């Protein structure tokens, strides 16, 4: 339905919004009143969409909190939430036993950028009161999924999620962005060097704040600065073998984070 309403397809700049709105009004001026009314209703419906996808885990979060409300502090000692995008979502789907056996909670949403993760961080992480959070974010930002961005903007979102976690006594594990030298859905983007630069910023920030940094990149990269084909079904997403490489790395990182005062 949203494809029928050009009004909502805007660029994240004031000029872009104005131009698209102007062109739409010129078009609608030539159309019948019923069509204009119908289009307006569609526009309102699209505008009301859940951009950060807060609804994705809302019921699951309620169920977890209800189920665990009487758990002791000792029973909560290993609760860990994984915040991320499709890489995290697929992880929980391809190897659910890894999550269930370790008391890990997957909160990945396909296609999400760090801006969207930040908006749902309170609901999908803080309200669950985990002992630690694993943050894996950035590749969809670089792909431009929610508009133009920079590695500094991505870092601002990662820093904000970190600060929210720490303010609520949640340990933080920051992860490198996985290697990728192309995005099938954004072929015009050349991400390899940007990912390397972003990972350096994440690593430096983790060091400066005495946080745990987990380096997935080095373990998964190939000679072309992309995802090793042995570990991924495409240029971005790990397969089960890839996740099996990642798992001991993140477990070690979580243990280090939980052992710190």
Q: For the regions a protein language model found, what residue spans apply to each?
A:
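Bacterial N-terminal signal peptides
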Residues: 34-43
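Hydrophobic residues within membrane-embedded alpha helices
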Residues: 7-8, 124
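N-terminal amphipathic/hydrophobic targeting modules at extreme N-termini
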Residues: 6, 12-18
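Serine-esterase "nucleophile elbow" of acetyl-processing enzymes
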Residues: 47-132
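Bacterial N-terminal signal peptides that target proteins for export
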Residues: 24-34
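Alpha-helical cap/lid subdomain in secreted, periplasmic
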Residues: 96-103, 118-261
């Amino acid at each position: 339905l949203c494809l029928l309403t050009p009004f909502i397809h805007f660029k994240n700049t004031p000029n872009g919004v104005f131009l698209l709105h102007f062109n739409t009004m010129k078009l609608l001026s030539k159309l019948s009143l019923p069509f204009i009314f119908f289009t307006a209703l569609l526009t309102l419906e699209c505008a009301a969409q859940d951009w950060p996808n807060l609804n994705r885990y809302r019921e699951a979060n309620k169920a977890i909190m209800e189920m665990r409300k009487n758990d002791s502090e000792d029973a909560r000692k290993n609760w860990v939430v994984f915040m991320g995008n499709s890489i995290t979502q697929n992880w929980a789907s391809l190897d659910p036993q890894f999550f269930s056996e370790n008391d890990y909670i997957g909160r990945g949403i396909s296609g999400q950028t760090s801006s969207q993760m930040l908006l749902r961080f309170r609901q999908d992480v803080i309200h669950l009161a985990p002992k630690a959070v694993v943050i894996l974010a950035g590749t969809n930002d670089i792909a431009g999924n929610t508009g133009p961005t920079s590695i500094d903007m991505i870092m601002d979102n990662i820093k904000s999620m970190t600060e929210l976690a720490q303010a609520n006594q949640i340990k933080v594990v920051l992860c490198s962005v996985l290697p990728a030298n192309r995005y099938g859905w954004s072929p015009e983007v050349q991400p390899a060097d940007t990912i390397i630069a972003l990972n350096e910023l994440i690593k430096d920030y983790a060091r400066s704040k005495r946080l745990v940094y987990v380096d997935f990149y080095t373990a998964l990269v190939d000679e072309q600065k992309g995802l090793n084909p042995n570990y991924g079904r495409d240029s971005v997403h790990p397969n089960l073998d890839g996740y099996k490489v990642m798992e001991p790395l993140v477990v070690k990182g979580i243990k280090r984070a939980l052992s710190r005062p």
